[in-house]
Amino acid sequence: MSSSLSLLAHLRPRVRARVRPSTIRCFIISQHLHSDASSVAETFLSRFQSLGPQTRMQTIDANQLQLLTLTLNRPTLFPGAPSLSNGAPAPQSAVPVPPGYHLAYFTPAFMESELGSDGTDASYNPDVPFTRRMWAGGEVLWPRLNGKPNPLRVGQDVLETTRVLSAQSKVVKKTGEDMIVVGVEKEFANEHGVSIIDRRNWVFRKALPVPSASTPSSAPPSSSTSHIATPNPTSSVISTEGNTYTRTLMQTPVTLFRFSALTFNPHKIHYSLPWARDVEGHKDIVVHGPLNLISILDLWRDTRQNFVDSTLVIPERITYRATSPLYAGEEYRIVLEEGESTKVEIIRPGGVVAMKAEIQ
């Protein structure tokens, strides 16, 4: 390092006065941190790929499907189907699972002592300090069988196969913070073959310190002061303009709590305001990424109710990416635009895009 500085001084004498030792140390530390992120990512990928695919078998339960439908504030599973509310029976055997609703199955099964400090399950976490997980996006495919979809159905025994596809170290553009992006693939197969291929991208950032009780919060005040129930999205007006469909929604703390419970998701940002605000820096509890994905798919199939069999309105593929958090109590719009492919945006107050998706 000293010889390099001597050469620099010889070639450009004026520069020497501006090169501080602290600057050099910061550069070395920065390089070391980025190297650590790369090393953690490589170790993680090597460990999980050496383990090979992980498999689980589960029966598609009617009760779980009923509760998810009601959590989404939809009284029926499909247009013209019997009501599922107020003591009504659960869907019958062989009823198809709507697109996206598979997310209520194969939920993580861990004791509380095995969870991370933020409540997330650590089943696919890189090593410390990269343990703060966020659902960044992904894609879901519904393969065709003889030209037709092969949906999961109530009562079927389904095999889930999970593979770790990738782990890459990256840098947050706005802050320069290191992070690791992990790609995971989940394949769901019934007796007829593969029904769903679900590829997810998780971002892992460094865990944040828990502030002391005396530390004031820097987050803006909470917006979830209203506990008015979310309106039934199927009865709400879908405004249309040409090939564009818009639905306005608002998620309440109760809806987020029920969705967390149903999907066995203990991530604290979805139900603990002190954690979301004081530790993570959010202004309120955060709407789940999977809940946003389901809401997009629900709007897509609600615009296709003229199909002969509404139970088989299933896309071939959706790609999606979360771009900004949504909060409880915020009214937001899902805007769907038809074309060669269907493009969807979830738009927060102020015109901020929270999620982008494309459906084929």
Which residues does each predicted region cover?
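HotDog/MaoC-like acyl-thioester-processing domains
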Residues: 17, 32-54, 137-251, 322-360
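Compositionally biased, intrinsically disordered low-complexity segments enriched
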Residues: 12, 22, 33-36, 290
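Long, contiguous hydrophobic alpha-helical segments, chiefly transmembrane helices and signal peptides
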Residues: 60, 98-106, 134-136, 140, ...
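Hydrophobic, proline/glycine-rich low-complexity stretches
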Residues: 4, 28-159, 315
